Amino acid sequence: MDKLSDASGQGACLRGTIREFEKCKGFGMWNCPEIIAEIQGRVGFLTLNRPKALNALTLPMIRALTAALLRWRDDPNIAAVAIRGMGREGPFGMFCAGGDIRFFHQAALAGDPVLEEFFTEEYALNHLIHTYPKPYLAFMDGIVMGGGMGISQGASLRIVTQHSKLGMPETYIGLFPDVGGGYFLSRLRGAAGEWLALTGQVLGAGPAVALGLADNYFPSQALPAAWAALADLDWSAPQALATWLAAHELAAPADNTLPLDAVDAYFSLESLAAIMVALEADPSAWASQTAISLRLRSPLMLHVALEQIRRARGLSLAEDLRMERDLVRHCFFTRHLARSGTSSETVEGIRAMVIDKDHQARWQPARIEDVTPEMVAPFFVSPWPSNAHPLRGLG
C-alpha cells in the first residue's frame, strides 16, 4: 500500500489514519485551513498557514501534510514538492516553531489519547519526508525549531536565509530532541550533535550550512521568485534543479564563530557529569555560559538526551524514530518509571516555561549529579512489544 504499511501483514502502523488517507480524493477532506496545498505546473506546493502561532504543528496539520505527500508521491504528474511557512505579513518570514506544546500540556494532564496519536503520526510524517522518492524542497526562512526541523531535515534541499534560526530546544522544556533529532543530530561532525541536543543552541544560516543542517543559502528577498519559478521548470531536464539553484542561491555567509574545538573537547566526554566538571573548570565566557545554560534544564532529561544521541549513531532512521516514540511516551506517561503523573519532567517544564512562565521548574532530581543510570535506563525500554509498536511499519 505505502511505506507506512506493515510488510509483515500485521496491519498498518497507523491503521485508522491510513484508512482515511485511502479515501482521499482531494485535500479538503481534512478541513484544515492551516495547510494550503496546491499544484502549479508539476510541483505540489505546501504552505504552513498558522502564523499567529508561529506555524506550530497540530494533529490536523500533520494529517493534512501526510495526505498531500502520499497523494503526490503516487501521482506521476507531480515531479517535486516544496514547503514554506506563512509569516505575519504574507508568505515566508517564518517556517515552523515546532509542535503545539500548550496542547501537549493540556492533553497530558487530561490523559487525552490524542497526544499518543499526535506523536505517532508526526514521527511517521518525518519518516515519509526523509524517504520521499521525489525532490522535497524546504524553504526554511525565519524560525525553524523542533517539529519544524522534523519536516525539513529530511528534505532534498534545505534552503536557509539571513533570517533563519534553526534549533532543537526541547531540553529547555524537559523533553529531548525528537522528530528524528537523534538520527540527524548524531550524524553531524564531531560532538556537535551532543552539543546541540543538550544546549538547544540556535544556529543562523552560516553555521547551519557549515554543520550540515542546511544545504543552500538564498537571500530572503529572492524567495518569492524562486518559489514561483519552480512551477515553470522543465522537470524532465536532468539539470533542472541545478539551473534553478544557480539562478537564486548565494554563498552562505562565512561563519567563524562555531566553537567546534571546544564542543568536541567537552561534549565528547563520557558522561554528563564529566562534561559539567570540565565546563565549570574552564574560565572562558563560552564554557561558563554553556554550563549555566545546562544547569537550568532538567537534569534527568539532559541525561536521557545524551544517551539518545549516542544510541542513535548506531540506528537507522526507522529505528531511531521507534526509540523516540518510546521516549516520548515515557516523558508524558510516567507510571512505568515509578514517577507520578504529575512528576513528568516535560509537563513541569512546559508549565514553568510556557504556561505559568515563572521559569522556576521543579526538576526531579534537582541536580545533574543526582541522576543515576537506574533513572535513565527505563526510558529506553519500549512499553510495547515489537509486533505492537505504533511505528512498527516503518521500513
Which ranges hold each PLM region?
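Conserved CoA-thioester-binding segment of acyl-CoA-metabolizing enzymes
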Residues: 23-84, 390, 395
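A structural preference for short, pocket-lining loop segments at secondary-structure junctions
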Residues: 41, 46, 64-109, 128-139, ...
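Glycine-rich beta-to-alpha active-site loop
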Residues: 87, 129-173, 196, 200-201, ...
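An acidic, glycine-rich surface segment that forms the CoA-thioester-binding/catalytic face
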Residues: 101-140, 181, 378-385, 391-392
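Contiguous mid-protein beta-loop-alpha structural module that forms a pocket-lining wall or clamp
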Residues: 180-183, 187-235
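Amphipathic alpha-helical blocks and their helix-capping loop/short-beta junctions
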Residues: 213, 218-297, 301
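C-terminal amphipathic alpha-helical interaction region
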Residues: 341, 345-395
